[in-house]
Structures are given as C-alpha cells and as structure tokens.
Amino acid sequence: MSVLHTLCDGYRGVIRNPATPNLKPTFVQFGASDTEIFMCSSYGLKFSIFDLATSRTIEISNPKFHQASVASRGFALRPGSGHFAILTRVAGKDIASVHHPKTRQVLRSWQPDTVDAQGLAWTPDGRWLLMWESAAQGHKILFCTPDGHLFKTWSGPSPWAIEEKHYELGAGVKHCQVSPDGARIAVCDHTRSVCVLETKSAAESMRLEHPATIAPRDTVQIWQEEIATTQSGSQHSFSRATQSVSAPGRASNGTVDTKPARTLSVFDASSSLLATTLEDWPSTVWVWDLASSELRAVLIFHSQILAFSWHPKQREVLMVTCEGDNYAGLVFVWDPLSDGPKTVHFRGQLPDAKVLGKPQASWLDWTGDSAVLLLGDSKHHLMASLAEAEESVAPWQDAHRNDLTMTTGKDETQMEAPALDDFDDDLSGLDMSEVDDTFSFKRT
C-alpha cells in the first residue's frame, strides 16, 4: 500500500501488510492525523495502526468488525483528545478497550455487558462512549464514561399504547446515530418508528412514527419523482403532491434487489433535522423537524435509496442517490426552500457520457457560500457547484491555494473534552487480568 503527499511530489510511503502479505486488506483509512493509518487485514485477523512518522506498527488481534461495509462500526476516535476505542471478540465474548492518543497503548480494557455488540461511538463532545447490543438481544445501549466505566443502560422505549405492551419482546436496535451537537441520539429498530434520546439524561425524549399514508399540509412537503423519456434520455423531475399518498413498499415480483433495503437515520449539520429511510418503504426519504417532532418533508423516488447525506457544514441541504443503472450519474439535492429536489446529471459531463464502474458522489467541505459536490466514477471526477445561475461564478474560479479542504468525513473540530482532563494514564490499580491477554501487540 502506497501513501502519497498531495503537496509534496517527492513524498512516498510504502506499507506492507504483515498479517496477510499476499491478500488485500479489507478496510483502510487515515486515523487521527495524516501520519496515522488504520487497516483491517483479511479474515479479520488483525487491526493494524501504522505511524508513518516513526515507522512503528501496533497490531490488535481479533477485531470484531473487519469487512469494508461494517469495519467503521467497530472503532472510534474520541473528538478532541484522539483516544482510540475498539471492539474485539475472543472466545465468544465482546471486549472493549480505550487506547492512548499518542502511543496507542491500552489504557483500559473490559468486557461490556453485551452478548453481541454491534458497534461503538463517541459522542461529539467526548463525554460518552456508546455501545449498542445486537437486535436479537432486545433494546440495549450502554452509556460509558471515557475511561470505560458503565454509567447507564437504555433498555428500550417505554410502551405508550396498550398494543405495545409486548414491545420489549421484539427485535432491538438496528441503527444508532448521534447528532453533530451531541445532544440527541436517533435509534432505529425493526418497527416503523424512530426513538430520539437525550444524551444528557440517556432517556427517550420523542418517538417519530412513520405514517402509512401521508397527507399534504402547509408544514409538510411531499415530492414525487416523475420520469419523462426524451430523445436525449430520461428526464427526472419532481411534482408536489396535493392529495394523500402512500409510500411505495418493497418490490414483490420475486426479483432480488442489488442491495437489501436499509433502515437509516442521519442528522443535518444543525442537528435540527433528521432524515430517515425504512426497509418497509425503501424508495422514500422522510425528513423530520426535531424542534416540533413533526414531519417536514417526504421525498418519494421510483428506485430504492442507495445513500443519502447532509452537507457537513451547511444546514438543511440533503443529497440522495438511488439504485439502478438508470440512476448511474444522477444525484438529487433537496433543501426546504427549494421547489422540490434538484437533479444533478453529471453523467453527461463525463467522457463519452458514460459512467465507468461505480458512480461516486460526496460533499466537499468548501469555505464558500455555495455547496459543492465531488462527482465521478472510477476514472474521472468533477466538481459541481449548487449556486444559482444568477449568482457569482463557480467558487473555485477565484479560489486560492488552501481554500479547499478535500474531506468527506465527519467534522473533527476540536472540542473541549473535560471528561478526560484528569484521565490517569497509569491504570495499574485496575484489575485487567482477565482481558489483557486478549490483545496482541507487535512493534516494527
């Protein structure tokens, strides 16, 4: 694996996979800095942390998640301090550990009260380390302090109706998402509702029920996709519903979808809006106003939702992509003040108007006023500004060096983290005899 510097042509680093040298790693990403790289080896044998500045490597055995689609659920970096937390599994038991922000040595490791934990995450202020249990084990989210001590356990929503009296017997947490401001946590399960928890109290504050039939109101926008066939190809537009509509369900024609439908929830940059999708209605995006606990908008497409994400800095700007060959090279962008979702057709801007391989779409963290998208395929990429035609020219035409931050990840803004101000690196007084032998470290 090679590491190149975008500003220094003569820089090149080479990393060799010591665990499985003849096999490709399943997951690679940068760590807390540009000189730190995380890598999962094939078959989940090792989780490796490479330090390019010192040419040192630390290996952690038996990471619980190693496949590309789920590896990021198994580890987390604490905002501000850079402490590293990871889930491993040995002899059928979950083990969590917190590592030093510089040396990555174990500060504490313990066995959480889980049967089959499905992920962990820090809150943006770094005050809590969250872990959630498998859906098969019911509703359970653990709120741990930064040094790994259990503070509180959320055991599911309280039944609000008579028909929900056996709610605790159903499947539990399917998806857990923390808001950018750290004040709320959205919890999706196998029902048609989303629970929103207050982080400070670790208690449920609201429940968002997805209705089977949506009635248009002044406060609710319902946009339905329309596809027209022209000589130049398909044209995608959206019309606002004036009558009650039902979200399309899953296809029942016996065909197998390219990807299974997913239940997801994502907060916008202001933490005031929450976008959700459900397995039962895979082609619909729901947008909720958390201040009023009401539905703000419903976006109905003709194809299953592939992905959606809010702009990392600008509030209330949502990007959606859909499954299918007909949607390759198409991106839809919505905001509450627009006249329906905008269609960005970037396939026509690529060479030969073809998408090679898997289409890619992500936000750029641009310092200008207009939102900017990075679009492309496996060979070509382009930038697209969402500024109106009457506005100024494309923002990059007058840009200077260092005006653009090429990032599509989370905002890693330095935050105050008082919970670790008095963190004692010397944990010799803790009893870790039962779990220390589950970690294997190798320095090179």
Give, region by region, the residue ranges found by the protein language model.
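Long, low-complexity intrinsically disordered regions enriched in Ser/Thr/Pro/Gly
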Residues: 1-444
